[in-house]
């Protein structure tokens, strides 16, 4: 049943940049997305995320962005990505509630919110929803 859902939920093929400072979350999210058929780039901080996005933006269909990162906040990274490409699709991921800063980022045009921790089904549904 889970396999049927995965195939139905994801057409795969798109490329996603995952930005998170926790190595375990990066690796697990990368593997989950790859199992759904996506190509995945990863970045552990804001500078790395912006560098990867600038280099690969023509290939990147979606950015999954952690809201709380050391050095550069998710909000600042979101704004920087939008300066590079105003049409970039961004899915905000956070262990914090949608209230406060996340709500402000969504109001500025972020494409969705994914509460952490998330399951494969939730990830697949939310990614597909934003990509469609």
Go through the PLM ranges and name each one.
Residues 45-48, 73-77:
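Acidic catalytic/metal-coordinating carboxylates
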Residues 66:
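Active-site residues of response regulator receiver
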Residues 2, 75-76, 83, 87, ...:
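Alpha4 helix (beta4-alpha4-beta5 surface) of REC/receiver domains from two-component response regulators
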Residues 26, 70, 98:
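The feature encodes the CheY-like receiver
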Residues 30, 42-62:
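Acidic, metal-coordinating helix/loop segments flanking the phosphotransfer/catalytic sites
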Residues 42, 69-72, 83:
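Residue-level signal for the "D+5" position in two-component response regulator receiver
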Residues 27-35:
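Charged docking surfaces used in two-component/phosphorelay signaling
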Residues 1-17, 54, 104:
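Disordered, acidic interdomain junction associated with two-component signaling
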């Amino acid at each position: 049943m889970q396999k049927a859902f995965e195939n139905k939920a994801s057409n795969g093929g798109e490329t996603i940049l995952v930005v998170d400072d926790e190595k375990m979350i990066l690796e697990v999210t990368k593997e989950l997305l790859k199992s759904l058929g996506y190509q995945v780039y990863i970045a552990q901080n804001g500078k790395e995320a912006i560098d990867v996005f600038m280099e690969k933006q023509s290939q990147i269909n979606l950015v999954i962005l952690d809201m709380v990162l050391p050095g550069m906040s998710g909000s600042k990274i979101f704004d920087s990505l939008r300066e590079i490409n105003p049409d970039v699709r961004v899915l905000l991921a956070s262990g914090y509630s949608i209230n406060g800063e996340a709500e402000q980022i969504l109001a500025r045009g972020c494409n969705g919110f994914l509460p952490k921790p998330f399951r494969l089904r939730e990830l697949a549904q939310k990614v597909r929803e934003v990509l469609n």
